[in-house]
C-alpha cells in the first residue's frame, strides 16, 4: 500500500554503507501526522486523505480552516496537505501516521520549496558561460550576451534565458531510497539531497513512477 507523510528537513550528513563508501543522506523529522480528512470515490469521485502536521493556535487559522478541523475533531494543525492514495479504506479521520509508515529500502518522492536566491544572473541561474576575460573582452564578462538580434526580428523571443528571480519553486525529487527509519525520534533518513532549507516543510510520498 502506498503511503505518505508530512515532515521537516533537519539537514544533511553522511554515513558509510556496507562496502565502506561514504553516502550523503538527508535527515527528515517526519510526523506524527493526523488524518484530518478522507475523500472517497462515492462522494468526491477520487480516493485521497488529508494530513495535518504541527499543532497551531486557534487564532492563527482562517475561519474555513477552523471549521474544517472542528468538524474533523482532530485539533488545530498548521500544515494541511492532501495525498491521493490508491487504497484508503483502512485509514480513518483521526488516525495518526508516524515515521514507521515507511521502512528501510522503500523508494519515495519528496516535494518541497527550493531555497530562494533572490535576483540572479544567467551564470548562477542557468549555468551559462562567461565571455573572455582578456584580449578586449570588455566589462561584460557576466552578461547574457546578444538577445534581440537586429531589425528582424527586433525583439527577444519568449523563453529566452535571462536574469531574474531564482528559487522558491516547488521541486520534487523522485526515486530516493529510505536508508533508515527511527520511529522513536520520528526520523526518516533518505539517500541524497532534497529541496529546501533546514526547517523547510517537505511532503514524502511512496514512489509514483518507476
Please provide the spans of the model-predicted regions:
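Glycine-rich phosphate/pyrophosphate-binding beta-alpha loops
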Residues: 196
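Mixed-charge, glycine-accented linear interaction segment located at domain edges/termini
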Residues: 200-202
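Basic, glycine/proline-rich low-complexity segments that contact nucleic acids
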Residues: 2, 9-18, 24-179, 188, ...
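Conserved small/polar residues in nucleotide/adenosyl-binding loops
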Residues: 208-210
Amino acid at each position: 500500500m502506498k503511503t505518505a507523510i508530512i515532515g521537516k528537513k533537519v539537514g544533511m550528513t553522511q554515513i558509510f554503507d556496507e562496502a565502506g563508501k561514504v553516502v550523503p543522506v538527508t535527515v527528515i523529522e517526519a510526523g506524527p501526522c493526523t488524518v484530518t480528512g478522507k475523500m472517497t470515490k462515492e462522494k468526491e469521485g477520487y480516493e485521497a486523505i488529508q494530513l495535518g502536521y504541527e499543532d497551531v493556535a486557534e487564532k492563527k487559522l482562517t475561519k474555513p480552516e477552523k471549521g474544517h478541523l472542528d468538524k474533523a475533531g482532530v485539533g488545530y494543525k498548521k500544515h494541511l496537505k492532501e495525498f491521493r492514495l490508491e487504497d484508503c479504506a483502512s485509514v480513518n479521520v483521526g488516525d495518526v501516521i508516524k515515521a514507521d509508515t515507511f521502512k528501510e529500502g522503500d523508494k519515495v518522492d519528496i516535494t518541497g520549496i527550493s531555497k530562494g536566491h533572490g535576483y540572479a544572473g544567467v551564470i548562477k541561474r542557468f549555468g551559462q558561460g562567461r565571455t573572455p576575460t582578456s584580449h578586449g573582452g570588455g566589462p561584460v564578462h557576466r552578461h547574457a550576451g546578444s538577445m534581440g538580434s537586429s531589425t528582424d526580428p527586433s525583439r527577444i523571443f519568449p523563453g529566452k534565458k535571462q536574469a531574474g528571480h531564482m528559487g522558491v519553486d516547488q521541486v520534487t525529487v523522485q526515486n530516493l531510497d529510505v536508508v533508515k527509519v527511527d520511529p522513536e525520534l520520528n526520523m526518516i533518513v533518505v539517500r541524497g539531497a532534497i529541496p529546501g532549507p533546514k526547517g523547510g516543510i517537505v511532503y514524502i510520498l511512496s514512489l509514483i513512477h518507476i
